[in-house]
């Protein structure tokens, strides 16, 4: 079956129309990733830092059990999705080849309702992320590598 030029043009235009929502969805997942896990300003979070950040990032209704904040720059985090700072890990995930300074906030206490209390663990860790179209969209874990 041979397509005429008008039909090819229609298929091309429809294809263009379907691409932006997919990219926009990936961008929104990347923005959510940054909102949940990225904090370039702090270098060494403590318990008060965790309580403040979890509240500011709206992760306290219910109290999120665990969350990791990455204290690096966006370019280095995005580079994990490529070959500059990442390598394949455990299926379709990527692990950073360099360590990032992170603060891990763990919920302490029995109730999942506010006020939420957190214990902080700060240190350098390699991070494991999922990527879509070259952007990090999910932080799976952080690994201490001596």
From Swiss-Prot:
Active site as annotated = 37, 138
Q: What range does the record give for the signal peptide?
A: 1-24
Location(s), subcellular: Secreted; Nucleus; Nucleus, Nucleolus; Cytoplasm, Stress granule
> Which Gene3D superfamilies would you find in this protein's record?
Ribonuclease A-like domain
Q: What is its main location?
A: secreted
State the disulfide connectivity.
50-105, 63-116, 81-131
The UniProt record gives the binding positions of tRNA as 105, 127
Listed EC numbers: 3.1.27.-
User: What SMART domains does the record point to?
Assistant: RNAse_Pc
GO cellular component, alphabetical, reads: angiogenin-PRI complex; basement membrane; cytoplasm; cytoplasmic stress granule; endocytic vesicle; extracellular space; nucleolus; nucleus
Q: Does the keyword DNA-binding apply?
A: yes
- What controls its activity? Has weak tRNA ribonuclease activity by itself due to partial autoinhibition by its C-terminus, which folds into a short alpha-helix that partially occludes the substrate-binding site. In absence of stress, the ribonuclease activity is inhibited by RNH1 in the cytoplasm. In response to stress, dissociates from RNH1 in the cytoplasm and associates with cytoplasmic ribosomes with vacant A-sites: ribosomes directly activate the tRNA ribonuclease activity of ANG by refolding the C-terminal alpha-helix. In response to stress, the angiogenic activity of ANG is inhibited by RNH1 in the nucleus.
Q: Kindly report, in one word, the top-level EC class recorded for this enzyme.
A: hydrolase
Gene Ontology biological process terms from the UniProt entry: actin filament polymerization; angiogenesis; antibacterial humoral response; antimicrobial humoral immune response mediated by antimicrobial peptide; defense response to Gram-positive bacterium; hematopoietic stem cell proliferation; innate immune response; negative regulation of apoptotic process
Task: Name the UniProt key words of this record, in alphabetical order.
Answer: Angiogenesis, Cytoplasm, Developmental protein, Differentiation, Disulfide bond, DNA-binding, Endonuclease, Hydrolase, Nuclease, Nucleus, Protein synthesis inhibitor, Pyrrolidone carboxylic acid, Secreted, Signal, Stress response
Instruction: Write down the InterPro entries for this protein, in alphabetical order.
Output: RNaseA (IPR001427), RNaseA-like_dom_sf (IPR036816), RNaseA_AS (IPR023411), RNaseA_domain (IPR023412)
- Gene Ontology MF terms in the entry: actin binding; copper ion binding; DNA binding; endonuclease activity; heparin binding; protein homodimerization activity; RNA nuclease activity; signaling receptor binding
Q: Which PROSITE patterns match?
A: RNASE_PANCREATIC
A single Pfam family it belongs to is: RnaseA
The motif Nucleolar localization signal: which residues?
55-59
Q: According to the UniProt entry, which residues carry Pyrrolidone carboxylic acid? A: 25
Q: Which family does it belong to?
A: Belongs to the pancreatic ribonuclease family.
Function per UniProt: Secreted ribonuclease that can either promote or restrict cell proliferation of target cells, depending on the context. Endocytosed in target cells via its receptor PLXNB2 and translocates to the cytoplasm or nucleus. Under stress conditions, localizes to the cytoplasm and promotes the assembly of stress granules (SGs): specifically cleaves a subset of tRNAs within anticodon loops to produce tRNA-derived stress-induced fragments (tiRNAs), resulting in translation repression and inhibition of cell proliferation. tiRNas also prevent formation of apoptosome, thereby promoting cell survival.
Assembly and partners are described as:
Homodimer. Interacts with RNH1; inhibiting ANG ribonuclease activity. Interacts with PCNA.
Q: Which PANTHER family is this protein grouped with?
A: ANGIOGENIN, RIBONUCLEASE
Protein name, per record: Angiogenin
Source organism of this protein record: Saimiri sciureus (Common squirrel monkey)
């Amino acid at each position: 079956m041979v397509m005429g030029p008008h039909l090819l043009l229609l298929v091309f235009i429809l294809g263009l129309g379907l691409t932006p929502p997919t990219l926009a969805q990936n961008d929104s997942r990347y923005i959510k990733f940054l909102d949940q896990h990225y904090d370039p300003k702090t270098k060494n979070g403590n318990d008060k830092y965790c309580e403040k950040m979890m509240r500011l990032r709206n992760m306290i209704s219910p109290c999120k059990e665990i969350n990791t904040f990455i204290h690096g720059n966006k370019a280095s985090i995005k580079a994990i999705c490529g070959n500059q700072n990442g390598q394949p890990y455990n299926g379709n995930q990527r692990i950073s080849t360099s360590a990032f300074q992170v603060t891990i906030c763990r919920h302490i206490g029995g109730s999942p309702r506010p006020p939420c209390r957190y214990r902080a663990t700060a240190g350098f860790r390699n991070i494991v992320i999922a990527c879509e179209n070259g952007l990090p969209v999910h932080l799976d874990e952080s690994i201490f590598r001596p």
